[in-house]
Structure formats: structure tokens, C-alpha cells
A protein has these predicted regions:
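Alpha-helical ds-nucleic-acid-binding substructure associated with the helix-hairpin-helix region
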Residues: 51-122
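Structural motif
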Residues: 13-24, 35-37, 79-84
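Short alpha-helix boundary/capping elements
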Residues: 34-39, 51-52, 97-100, 143-144
Length: 212
């Protein structure tokens, strides 16, 4: 991984770990849902402390699930849903062991195109289509992992100068800008919901009529 200093957890030690450890970054990405992103990306550092060792895919994959869940749930919990996230992270590490010889960085280092990189990431436990695109954008923008077509694979999150996702967070100010964008998108979606609900019966009626 490139020696770029990430600024996601907004904590010096946690961000240093994310910057140098590919597995820590992947785990942070998995945790980044339904909780503040700083909390999510603090998770890998707190997990290393609770496990008493550096993060290792083979080690986590082979641990007793209940033991791992306990490490996630110990206050302060690593996530709002520590049990399910512990299971998801363990599934992630098993894929890394089985498909990438235990080397998480191989997921992107051996991808020859952006499309291939996106497919690989989307196939990982804990990554949907949008999160996979965001991670491709993060790799390309901040870690200089730029296989051919990476921006196209990242979609809108790969746009230069955007402030749409964690791929664009480089300091406290950009974090605020990303938060404002997400807030605006959430408000827009909320406004659109009643209109869509109102239009649904009419569309259903029209479809039924045309099917006669």
C-alpha cells in the first residue's frame, strides 16, 4: 500500500494503522454502515488491542466465533451491531485466506482493470455495489491504486474534486463537506418518497388497464 496518510478516523493512531495495513482498511470499510464513520474506522485499532496482536486474516478466520464476537461487543463496542459485524469480518478474512493466500492487498494489486477490481471488491462479504465503488475510488484517489478504467468503475465517486464519500476525506474540513452532501442527499430522498408513494397506485392502475 502506498504510504499515503489517510484521515478517516480523525485519530492519529487509528489513521496510521489504516494507512499501513490493508486488512485494517477493509475491516473499517465493512464496519462503515449505520454508525458514524469515525467510530467505524476506529474499529480496526481497537480490535488489535483486544486481540493483543496485529491484524492477520488467517488468525481472525480461525478464531472461535464467540470469542471474536466478544471482542467486538466489549464496551465500547466496535459497532452498533457487534455480533453480526464480527461474523461479517470473519467471513471477509476467510475469503482473503481462501482466495488471496491471506494477503488482503492482493485483492487490488493483482487486478488488471478497474472493472475487475470492482468485481473483486463487490464479491467480498460486507460490500455492496455502492460501497465497492466507494472503495475503488478511495484506492484510486488516495492510495494511487489506479488500474485502467478505475474512475469509470468507481462511477460518480471517482469524479475529481467531488465531496461525496470517504474517498474524498483528507481532513476535518473535507469530512464536513462530505457530511453536508450526504445530508442533502438524504433530505432529497425523503422529499421524493411521498411523491413516489402517491404515484404508485396510478401506475398500478394504468398497468392493470393496459393488461386487459
Amino acid at each position: 500500500m502506498a504510504p499515503k496518510k489517510l484521515c478517516l478516523a480523525q485519530d492519529k493512531d487509528a489513521d496510521a494503522l489504516l494507512s499501513r495495513d490493508p486488512l485494517a482498511l477493509l475491516i473499517g470499510m465493512v464496519l462503515d454502515q449505520q454508525i458514524p464513520l469515525e467510530w467505524a474506522f476506529m474499529g480496526p485499532l481497537n480490535l488489535t488491542k483486544r486481540l493483543g496482536r496485529d491484524l492477520d486474516a488467517a488468525d481472525i478466520a480461525s478464531r472461535d466465533p464467540e470469542e471474536l464476537a466478544k471482542a467486538f461487543a466489549t464496551p465500547p463496542a466496535l459497532h452498533r451491531f457487534p455480533g453480526s459485524m464480527a461474523g461479517r469480518v470473519q467471513e471477509l478474512t476467510k475469503v482473503i485466506v481462501d482466495q488471496y493466500d491471506g494477503d488482503p492487498a492482493a485483492i487490488w494489486k493483482t487486478a488488471s482493470t478497474g472493472a475487475e477490481l470492482l468485481r473483486r471488491i463487490e464479491a467480498l462479504p460486507g460490500f455492496g455495489k455502492q460501497k465497492a465503488k466507494i472503495f475503488v475510488a478511495l484506492l484510486g484517489k488516495q492510495l494511487k491504486v489506479q488500474p485502467k478504467g478505475w474512475q469509470e468503475a468507481a462511477g460518480e465517486f471517482g469524479d475529481d474534486g467531488s465531496r461525496k464519500s470517504i474517498a474524498d476525506i483528507t481532513d476535518g474540513a473535507s469530512l464536513g463537506e462530505v457530511r453536508e452532501y450526504k445530508k442533502a442527499m438524504k433530505a432529497k430522498a425523503k422529499q421524493a418518497a411521498p411523491a413516489a408513494k402517491k404515484a404508485a397506485p396510478a401506475a398500478k392502475k394504468a398497468a392493470a388497464k393496459s393488461g386487459r
